[in-house]
């Protein structure tokens, strides 16, 4: 059978029509069923116009393989994680292309316990079976069932268990759901907090789910996607802004002045919040930017543990270390009590509680950390020969470096600054992150120097 190019390193993503269509979705469902032989799995889909049809084709493939399907309807990826571990079923699949272009869709697959099915943990096996298409005949008597269910209330219960609602003082929040799947969840949290008497006001923008994305595809990692949130925070005098991508597995925060807060500093903030409640705990972080997280965690009596970037690696490391929390600078936050999975809803709830408990604004909470360890933000360079360019940078700094680490790409540390350079798994791009010890001009100069070396 033909090659299925929609199978990527960690998930399934492809252009609609040729790379991903209902026939391919059916084959993926059959292949998942033949490979894992699950009894019951949960399905959900994001707001994209094709998600429902792809999900139903996937369901048909699973049913034809003898699998019972529970459909939770329109959902974010983390709602599939939650459904999988909460119901104790054998796996789950979310149909989503997150922040990919309009003409794309995709899938994220998990097995029991919401463990990821990634490249070397089953995704290649599912791909092989789907490509071969050599499935046994459908046995009508053994065909799986299909049922629609709602777990929204149980999911909201779980989210609010991470905070004490009575810690919340008067708070005004701008929330930008980007017309993605987050809107109905935000509505449900708002209703629940109101019922509990919490003095939290929600100002909701682009809250209605709309697969045509009239306000652009939501990806607040891109500066051009931040304006609406920033302006709303300033206009309404809000305490904080929250923005989501399409399947809300990432959450992006803005302070009371509408300033975007880099995910790196939120990792430190959440680590501190967890260590106050769980002294001595382990915190997982990625290798791109590390000094702030290490300093915060160590000062709070915790143990920082570095892991390779990427959700499959972070989740596995969290399990082996029994870490309470893990954070990546890309705004992915992982929680032990959430089956070690990432959530875009838990972080903003914790930060909102922290703002109330400390009696400080979000800007005040991160200002000192940003000054102590200024960072470049991730800079992408499209290069013809990434490996040769990285080798050039390493050779240039080899004598000066105090430490070299290859957990993920190349990290080199010096007395007052450090950098990480890594090749993308998915495109011919090299990603650079630079940070310093309280010296913005040094950080900027070294960033410029490395970029010149990469492009020389």
Swiss-Prot record:
The lineage of its organism: Bacteria, Pseudomonadati, Pseudomonadota, Gammaproteobacteria, Enterobacterales. Binds 1 Mg(2+) ion per subunit. One of its GO terms (biological process) is GDP-mannose biosynthetic process. NCBIfam families: PRK15414.1. It is an enzyme of class 5 (isomerase). This is Phosphomannomutase. Mg(2+) binds at residues 98, 245, 247, 249. Involved in GDP-mannose biosynthesis which serves as the activated sugar nucleotide precursor for mannose residues in cell surface polysaccharides. This enzyme participates in synthesis of the LPS O antigen. The keyword Heme does not apply. CDD domains: PMM_PGM. It comes from the Bacteria. InterPro entries: A-D-PHexomutase_a/b/a-I, A-D-PHexomutase_a/b/a-I/II/III, A-D-PHexomutase_a/b/a-II, A-D-PHexomutase_a/b/a-III, A-D-PHexomutase_C, A-D-PHexomutase_C_sf, A-D-PHexomutase_CS, Alpha-D-phosphohexomutase_SF. The gene is manB. Keywords: Isomerase, Lipopolysaccharide biosynthesis, Magnesium, Metal-binding, Phosphoprotein. Disulfide bonds: none annotated. SUPFAM superfamilies: Phosphoglucomutase, C-terminal domain, Phosphoglucomutase, first 3 domains. Its EC number is 5.4.2.8.
């Amino acid at each position: 059978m033909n090659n299925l190019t929609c199978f990527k390193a960690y998930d399934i993503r492809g252009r609609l029509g040729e790379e991903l269509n209902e026939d391919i979705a059916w084959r993926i469902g059959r292949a998942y069923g033949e490979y894992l032989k699950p009894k019951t799995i949960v399905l959900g889909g994001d707001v994209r116009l094709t998600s429902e049809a792809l999900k139903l084709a996937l369901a048909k493939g699973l049913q034809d393989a003898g699998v019972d399907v529970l459909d939770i309807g329109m959902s974010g990826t983390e709602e599939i994680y939650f459904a999988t571990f909460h119901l104790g079923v054998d796996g789950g699949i979310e149909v989503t292309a997150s922040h990919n272009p309009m003409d794309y869709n995709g899938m994220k697959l998990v097995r029991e316990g919401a463990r990821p099915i990634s490249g070397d943990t089953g995704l290649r096996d599912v791909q092989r079976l789907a490509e071969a298409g050599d499935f046994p005949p459908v046995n009508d008597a053994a065909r799986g069932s299909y049922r629609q269910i709602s777990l929204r209330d149980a999911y909201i219960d779980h989210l609010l268990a991470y905070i004490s609602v009575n810690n919340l003082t008067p708070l005004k929040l701008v929330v930008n759901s980007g017309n993605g799947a987050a809107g109905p969840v935000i509505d449900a949290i708002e209703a629940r907090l109101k019922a509990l008497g919490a003095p939290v006001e929600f100002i909701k923008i682009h809250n209605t789910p709309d697969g045509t994305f009239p306000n652009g595809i939501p990806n607040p990692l891109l500066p051009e996607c931040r304006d609406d949130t920033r302006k709303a925070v300033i206009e309404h005098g809000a305490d904080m802004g929250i923005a989501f991508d399409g399947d809300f597995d990432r959450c992006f925060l803005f302070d009371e002045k509408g300033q975007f807060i880099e995910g790196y500093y939120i990792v430190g903030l959440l680590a501190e919040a967890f260590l106050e409640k769980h002294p001595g705990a382990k915190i997982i972080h990625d290798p791109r930017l590390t000094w702030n997280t290490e300093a915060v965690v160590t000062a709070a009596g915790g143990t920082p543990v570095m892991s390779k970037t990427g959700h499959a690696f972070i989740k596995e490391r969290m399990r082996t270390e029994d870490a309470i929390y893990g954070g990546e600078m890309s705004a992915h936050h992982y929680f032990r009590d959430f089956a070690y999975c990432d959530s875009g809803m838990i972080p903003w709830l914790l930060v909102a509680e922290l703002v109330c408990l400390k009696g400080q604004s979000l800007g005040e909470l991160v200002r000192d950390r940003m000054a102590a360890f200024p960072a470049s933000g991730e800079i992408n360079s499209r290069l013809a020969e990434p490996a040769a360019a990285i080798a050039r940078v390493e050779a240039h700094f080899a004598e000066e470096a105090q430490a070299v680490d290859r957990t993920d790409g190349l990290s080199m540390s010096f007395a007052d600054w450090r950098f990480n350079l890594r090749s993308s798994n998915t495109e011919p791009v090299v990603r650079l992150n630079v940070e310093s010890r309280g010296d913005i001009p040094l950080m900027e100069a070294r960033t410029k120097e490395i970029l010149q070396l990469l492009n020389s």
